[in-house]
Amino acid sequence: MRIEEDLKLGFKDVLIRPKRSTLKSRSDVELERQFTFKHSGQTWSGVPIIAANMDTVGTFEMAQALAGFDILTAVHKHYTVEEWATFINTASADVLKHVMVSTGTSDADFEKTVQILALNPALNFVCIDVANGYSEHFVQFVAKAREAWPTKTICAGNVVTGEMCEELILSGADIVKVGIGPGSVCTTRVKTGVGYPQLSAVIECADAAHGLGGMIVSDGGCTMPGDVAKAFGGGADFVMLGGMLAGHEESGGSVVEENGEKFMLFYGMSSESAMNRHVGGVAKYRAAEGKTVKLPLRGPVGNTARDILGGLRSACTYVGASRLKELTKRTTFIRVQEQENRIFNSL
């Protein structure tokens, strides 16, 4: 046993220090980025935000809506091959360019992903997702996926430390998914005692990944547009959002009514709700590591997307970054004990 005494920070622990700027308007900020990925060799351009691969966020409807904002969607892994075929037949080439195919690490998951990718060559992204990316089996699966799909861009996770980030990139991942426990409906940290403050995880993993020519996506912990800006400021190439995109018309959650008001269910993918729905319940040897919440219906996701992108543009103007690419170089974090004046928050 040992104790590391280095301070680790989350998004709530910092603010971004403003700097002189020559920008006249938020409209001068370019949020689109262009990436060429290390292993696949593919080039992609767009706004580097990803809707999370949760079945109450990463839906086909969400992909259709967010493609209009140049945003990616990691479509959840519980759609059947037949449902994928129907979606692909109706979706435009531009929508498919903004879609990630999500998979687990079982043999059945692999075979299903092979079938989905064979439906259309425009499906260029694969998201290999497990809660704990530190297992040897996971690393071997990433290597197997890279061998099977040499020209597909592979996103794999989740991990929170530099050495494992490097391991996944060397095994074939183009993008490493960073985050253990920060999600709004994740209870891993309280159930297991395991985790890592998200901002520090992003900073450390970005440093490791970029040294090898890889990239990272910050997954979890964003509760407002300012957190998205902080993630990019900390070095994230992409930011994945779950809770911020839940509760919308396109989110796919079940709608319940209480006292005449409608709510949408949103749950973590390791929650009892998710396991009851997809695997017939919580196995005897494990505990649920997620919760279920009821969110007021929030209307079309486009309104939220505009709010997030507007906040991101504004953050860039405050530090003089004319392009999102420059935000990291222009960011200085200051440690704080408060984020906002909360006097009227209860009203």
Swiss-Prot record:
The active site is at C186 (thioimidate intermediate). It comes from the Bacteria. GO terms for biological process: purine nucleotide metabolic process. The keyword Secreted does not apply. This is GMP reductase. Gene3D superfamilies: Aldolase class I (3.20.20.70). InterPro entries: Aldolase_TIM, GMP_reductase, GMPR, IMP_DH/GMP_Rdtase_CS, IMP_DH_GMPRt. It is an enzyme of class 1 (oxidoreductase). Homotetramer. NCBIfam families: GMP_reduct_1, PRK05096.1. K(+) binds at G181, G183. GO terms for cellular component: cytosol; GMP reductase complex. It comes from Salmonella gallinarum (strain 287/91 / NCTC 13346). Catalyzes the irreversible NADPH-dependent deamination of GMP to IMP. It functions in the conversion of nucleobase, nucleoside and nucleotide derivatives of G to A nucleotides, and in maintaining the intracellular balance of A and G nucleotides. GO terms for molecular function: GMP reductase activity; metal ion binding. Keywords: Metal-binding, NADP, Oxidoreductase, Potassium.
